A protein has these predicted regions:
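Anion-binding alpha/beta catalytic cores of soluble intermediary-metabolism enzymes, centered on
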Residues: 1-216, 221-284
């Protein structure tokens, strides 16, 4: 399979596997979290453990302990401030972030006008990724796409144009190195190109008009943004103006973490659980 068109396909594959991933749900006191967990449980791809401790720090630490003891495969944020949960994930009893790993946010979107799911990073965690961090992002996104059934993901390194500009945008020189490393198979089976702008990443017609040749061919599966501002604006624009359906998780930790906002819908939290469940068990 080379594409995943929508979240329903993700859920269908999970149902076929008939494996329930154990989810530690921290402070499940909001309606959308409860409904998403109930729906995912009824669909048969998660088994939820609700951590209801009124002491939020203790609740977060309990979730971390469950992962460390092998009794939870995933963590989900409920009605708890992100900073409390992240502090436990990063620090409690050694935390869940292996040495040398990068904590990064990734999202997956089903945009009505777009023919397949689109993955992107980072819209919430890393303000200005370093070159080394971006290399890890490429690896994480490759692994995630493989877990989602995309054999050879096409990964676009996003910029405002297709020109390398070391003076004003030094990260574009790093893009060139990442592309070369991908060609030599460093990230596994994937295709990486950049710099590309958003349109040439996702539109073959735009590539044709600009006269640009790219192995991605205007058919990107993954967008890697240069900074959090670009990623966050894209994240909010597609929901506000395009009615996109979203999933959001954290990568880099020992297990997937569903870290949605309190304002996110039941659907977003349900789809996030589905993506996390698809990834669970494949972490390196």
């Amino acid at each position: 399979m080379e594409t995943t068109q929508n979240f329903n396909e993700v859920v269908t594959r999970l149902k076929r596997k008939d494996i329930r991933r154990r989810v530690a749900v921290v402070s499940p006191h909001d309606k959308s979290t409860i409904e998403a967990v109930k729906r995912a449980s009824e669909d048969g791809f998660i088994e939820a453990v609700m951590i209801n401790d009124d002491n939020l720090q203790a609740a977060a630490e309990q979730a971390v302990t469950m992962v460390q003891q092998g009794t939870a495969d995933m963590i989900m944020k409920g009605l708890i401030p992100s900073e409390i949960l992240l502090k436990a994930i990063l620090r409690y009893n050694g935390g869940l972030l292996p040495e040398g790993h990068l904590l990064t946010h990734t999202a997956c979107a089903h945009i009505p006008q777009h023919p397949k799911l689109l993955f992107y990073t980072d819209a919430a965690v890393i303000p200005f990724p370093t070159h080394e961090q971006r290399i890890q992002q490429v690896q994480y996104m490759t692994d995630l796409c493989h877990a989602m059934g995309i054999k050879t993901p096409k990964i676009a390194l996003i910029h405002c144009s297709e020109e390398v500009d070391e003076r004003h945008f030094p990260y574009t020189a790093g893009y060139t190195e990442i592309v070369e490393r991908a060609k030599h198979g460093e990230f596994g089976q994937c295709v990486v190109d950049g710099p590309l702008d958003l349109k040439t990443s996702c539109s073959a017609e735009s590539l044709k008009v600009k006269g640009i040749a790219s192995p991605i061919a205007g058919d990107a599966d993954v967008l890697i943004f240069p900074n959090i501002e670009a990623g966050n604006v894209f994240h909010k624009t597609i929901t506000l103006f395009n009615n996109a359906k979203l999933a959001s998780i954290l990568l880099g930790t020992r297990v997937p973490v569903v870290l949605t906002s309190r304002a996110d819908t039941t659907d977003t939290k349900y789809y996030s659980l589905a993506v996390a469940a698809a990834l669970s068990g494949t972490e390196k």
